Amino acid sequence: MMPFDIRVGQGYDVHALVPGRKLILGGVEIPHDRGLLGHSDADALLHAVTDALFGAAALGDIGRHFPDTDAQFAGADSRALLREAARRVREAGYEIGNVDATVIAQAPKLAPHIGAMVANLAEDLAIARGRCNVKAKTNEKLGFEGRQEGIVAQAAVLLWRASVADAQD
């Protein structure tokens, strides 16, 4: 029997880029001529991290907890949803080890905003900045990301619990 219950979760989200919406990634408003379409603020990065948290803790997915059919989540701040997801994961007995995320977007350039995204993740998850990582990639002008039709985010998280005896069956 392992002395620790270690869990890894993977999250994914994609949203279309459309005119008339703000572009918000990692809780940062990024200047761009289009934004992401969605029921909430459509922050694909935070949605991927939220999904990874729920998955690692075997708590389902973001749609189960914050359904896009529920009017209370219309226009929701994804940072608030992420904080609530972290609370539920901790309530289930887990601590957040680290987060590694990738945003795939041909444009705009995200590198100038990575530091603010990492700071928001660390604050919302109540973990050190050194345990959060965000990478920005292009899709080399291939696929819908390369044509600037949408943005994809992927995330991996590690959770741990000090005793497997506490694990839910």
Swiss-Prot record:
Site note Transition state stabilizer, residues: 39, 138
Pfam families: YgbB
The reaction(s) this protein catalyses: 4-CDP-2-C-methyl-D-erythritol 2-phosphate = 2-C-methyl-D-erythritol 2,4-cyclic diphosphate + CMP
Pathway(s) of this molecule: Isoprenoid biosynthesis; isopentenyl diphosphate biosynthesis via DXP pathway; isopentenyl diphosphate from 1-deoxy-D-xylulose 5-phosphate: step 4/6
Organism domain of life: Bacteria
Cofactor note: Binds 1 divalent metal cation per subunit.
Keyword NAD: no
Keywords recorded for this protein, A-Z: Isoprene biosynthesis, Lyase, Metal-binding
Cofactor(s) the protein requires to work: a divalent metal cation
Binding sites annotated in the UniProt record for 4-CDP-2-C-methyl-D-erythritol 2-phosphate: 13-15, 39-40, 61-63, 66-70, 144, 147
GO biological process: isopentenyl diphosphate biosynthetic process, methylerythritol 4-phosphate pathway; terpenoid biosynthetic process
Amino acids binding a divalent metal cation: 13, 15, 47
Functional description taken from the UniProt entry: Involved in the biosynthesis of isopentenyl diphosphate (IPP) and dimethylallyl diphosphate (DMAPP), two major building blocks of isoprenoid compounds. Catalyzes the conversion of 4-diphosphocytidyl-2-C-methyl-D-erythritol 2-phosphate (CDP-ME2P) to 2-C-methyl-D-erythritol 2,4-cyclodiphosphate (ME-CPP) with a corresponding release of cytidine 5-monophosphate (CMP).
Membership in a protein family: Belongs to the IspF family.
Record text on subunit structure and interactions: Homotrimer.
Name this protein carries in UniProt: 2-C-methyl-D-erythritol 2,4-cyclodiphosphate synthase
Gene: ispF
